[in-house]
Amino acid sequence: MLTILTLKILLMIVYLSHWDWNLYKSRKDIVLNLDELNIKSICPEGIYTKELKTIYQEHINWKIDREKTFDLKGVINLKNILNSLEGGTIVHSFTLKTGILYSVANLFVNNRIKGVLSINGLGYLFSNNFKAKLLKLLLKTFIKKSFNKSFKEIIFQNESDKEIFLKFSGYSGRISLIKGSGIELNNYIKKETYQTEKLKVIFVSRLLIDKGVNNYIELTKNILDSNIDFYLAGEIDDGNPNSITQKDLEKIKNLDNVKYIGSINVEKELFNYDISIIMSKYEGFSRILLESLYIGLFCISNNIPGTRWLKEFNNGFLVENNNLNSISKVINNFKEYGFSKADAESNREIIKKKYSTKIISNQYNEIYNNLASS
């Protein structure tokens, strides 16, 4: 029988995504905390390729066009990459789109690899967009037939996504619930001073319609108080059909009621703000909400399955259906909420015990070791 030590020596893990951002921004800390050091990345080359090469043992360029709904050449390239892997390799796909592309390529893979899929929110495919609904209908039969063969285990971030997807897909393999990707606690500058006047409100997100960027712009028009400043941080996602356009962004830049500040270093800069707004319509487990809580901001979030856990904490307020009047009322009457440094410290203790990168990485380790021994 193989010992745990032997398993770790033999174990090869590959992280797969159709976007380099996924394997850097949300996974780099997990990789650095895993017991197994033999981890490769497969994703298209992009602005984070240089960083990926310093974190993963090897980076393999997946030649795929993110802007296409289905890139046949990209699937063929992935098939060739998968066939080059050693038998027994664990291929961990991140996002539902990547999982679908992997399942297509896997139909033509000859070696015995073990698939794992992390569904970090159901995303575009399960949105109310007409094209998305049509695409979901077309893919339903394929997903039902292929996912049980392609994936030994599927990881969800909340119960609602799990129930919806299992009903849709008929998946019958192993299932795990891991809440988020965790945060590396020592990387963050904590907020030390708290104020109730001259507030700085910030919305940090990819600039997607479903993330609520247009709702946020409407909110800034609702509150005309010289003591409240609004900031928008994030970038257009050209490979996402739900992204705002460059023309939309130029209009935002010309607005007087909100300041667009581009991409920010959340770990080092977010402490400068007072209130974090999350207006997403769909979310697996909101990372920016977790980061905002740990840093010490007051958080106002749309009440969806991926943010509902905010109820555990002191410094948060959930609103229904992004109700602008409810959000405006909280901001305008912020003094009444009495949020303090002591509340922030209490929240940090919860995060240390439940949501740190180390906690999440241990759950990943358990999954990989179980797969290696099966």
Annotate each predicted stretch with a short phrase:
Residues 93-99, 119-120:
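Short His-centered aromatic/hydrophobic patch
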Residues 60-61, 144, 148-189:
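Donor nucleotide-sugar binding/catalytic pocket of nucleotide-sugar-dependent glycosyltransferases
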Residues 244-263:
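Nucleotide-activated donor-binding/catalytic signature segment of Leloir-type glycosyltransferases, i.e.
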Residues 24-29, 203, 208-222, 290:
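A conserved mid-protein helix/loop that constitutes part of the nucleotide-sugar donor-binding site
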Residues 281:
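Aromatic "clamp/platform" in nucleotide-sugar-dependent glycosyltransferases that forms part
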Residues 298-301:
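Short hydrophobic beta-strand element within catalytic cores of glycosyltransferases
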Residues 42-48, 183, 204, 229-246:
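Glycosyltransferase donor-sugar binding loop
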